[in-house]
């Protein structure tokens, strides 16, 4: 809901917002809905302080993940089970974009006019969306087959780690990714020209944006094969985690134009924020073995090994331009309804999907032998770009 006070009138606003984020890593394509309530203008002798609250309903095209879980038909040979490209193999989770569903949020905006004619003022806003989450959970006593695919850097071919296979192992795969998105600004506004029903103002201030993703992969595999060299009942718990965060801080510059004709209002806004993205990434993995009542934990999972595990940071120049257009209609004294579009372009956002390297040197799997081979998986801040969009209705 939005409650706004201003002169000469206030009202319901219908905003259609499109936000485009150019990302480092997988993209974030968002579609948003801003659903404010009818608002009424203050009387002529009211104060200069104004406050508004918005309910947001956004959908974000989230993180692009590589294939993470596979299966194969019954009767598939063990060496082909879950292997990408093998006959009958299919992807159960991954090779897709996650966290692109509708989610709710709130935005608060406050401002103050320094003069009674409302030509000079300040304003600030904050928005936050609820956390988006995607889960995958699968368990099997052996059938169906469950596997985690990877590319074997030593054999130079596709391979898979089995969590469930008939007569060999029984287990499960559990994956969860969460995503958050929020932002704020603080602006100084001053009118620079007024010609009849047309008014132009400039903006200068500070802008902040935050994007974060957390991906956790947990697998279990319990040995069911008798005489295979590993005691029956031995359980392997393998964990990989990937976290990515981007924080933008920048100088926001812009101009606003307003045109009124009878009950109609047209407002456009063009801004650009120049600053820096502070990108951070954390990769961790572990393998716990439970056998005969004894438990041992070693560093390294499957896709998070000694070659890429750790904490990383990066600072890069970033640009956040924005173009907005709103149309309003005063349908009663002191009331109006509005609709519009907003386009934001954010460069350099890091996502977890592009932190994942699916090429693995088996010699680095715990217990690591260190017998040579490439340092894979490897870490890198991915520089691919995408076009996240946000649409809004109110």
Residue ranges and their predicted role:
Residues 64-73, 77-101, 131-180, 210-247, ...:
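Extracellular/periplasm-exposed beta-strand and loop segments of Gram-negative cell-envelope proteins
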Residues 35-42, 111-116, 189-195, 257-263, ...:
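Outer-membrane beta-barrel proteins
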Residues 1-42:
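Cleavable N-terminal export/targeting peptides
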Residues 53, 108-112, 124, 186-190, ...:
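Residues on the lipid-exposed face of transmembrane beta-strands in outer-membrane beta-barrel proteins
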Residues 50, 57, 384-394:
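Outer-membrane beta-barrel "beta-signal"
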Residues 47-49, 106, 118-120, 196-202, ...:
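Outer-envelope beta-barrel architecture signal
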């Amino acid at each position: 809901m939005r409650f706004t006070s201003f002169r000469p009138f206030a009202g319901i606003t219908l905003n259609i917002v499109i936000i485009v984020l150019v990302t480092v890593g997988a993209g974030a394509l968002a579609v948003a809905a801003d659903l404010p309530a009818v608002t009424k203008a203050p009387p002529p002798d009211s104060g200069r302080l104004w406050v508004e609250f918005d309910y947001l309903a956004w959908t974000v095209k989230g993180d692009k993940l590589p294939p993470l879980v596979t299966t194969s038909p019954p009767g598939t040979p063990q060496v082909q089970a879950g292997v990408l490209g093998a006959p009958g193999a299919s992807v159960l989770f991954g090779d897709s974009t996650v966290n692109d569903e509708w989610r709710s949020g709130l935005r608060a905006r406050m401002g103050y006019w320094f003069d009674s004619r409302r030509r000079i003022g300040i304003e600030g806003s904050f928005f936050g969306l609820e956390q988006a989450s995607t889960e995958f959970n699968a368990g099997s006593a052996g059938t169906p087959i469950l596997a985690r695919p990877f590319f074997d850097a030593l054999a130079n071919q596709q391979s898979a780690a089995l969590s469930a296979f008939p007569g060999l192992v029984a287990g499960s795969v559990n994956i969860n990714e969460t995503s958050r998105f929020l932002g704020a600004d603080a602006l100084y506004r001053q009118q620079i020209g007024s010609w009849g029903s047309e008014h132009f103002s400039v903006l200068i201030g500070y802008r902040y944006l935050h994007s974060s993703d957390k991906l956790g992969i947990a697998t279990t595999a319990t040995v069911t094969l008798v005489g295979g060299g590993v005691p029956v009942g031995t359980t392997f718990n393998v964990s990989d985690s990937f976290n990515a965060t981007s924080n933008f801080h920048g100088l926001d510059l812009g101009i606003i134009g307003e045109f009124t004709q009878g009950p109609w209002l047209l407002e456009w806004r063009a801004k650009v924020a120049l600053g820096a993205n502070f990108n951070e990434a954390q990769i961790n993995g572990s393998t716990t073995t439970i056998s005969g009542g004894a438990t041992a934990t070693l560093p390294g999972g499957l896709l998070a090994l000694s070659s890429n595990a750790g904490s990383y940071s990066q600072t890069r120049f970033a640009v956040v331009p924005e173009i907005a257009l709103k149309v309003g209609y005063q349908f009663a004294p002191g009331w109006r309804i509005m609709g519009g579009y907003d386009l934001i372009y954010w460069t350099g956002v890091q996502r977890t999907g592009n932190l994942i390297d699916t090429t693995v040197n088996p010699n680095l799997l715990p217990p690591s032998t260190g017998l040579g081979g490439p340092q894979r998986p490897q870490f890198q801040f991915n520089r691919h770009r995408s076009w996240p969009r946000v649409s809004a209705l109110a």
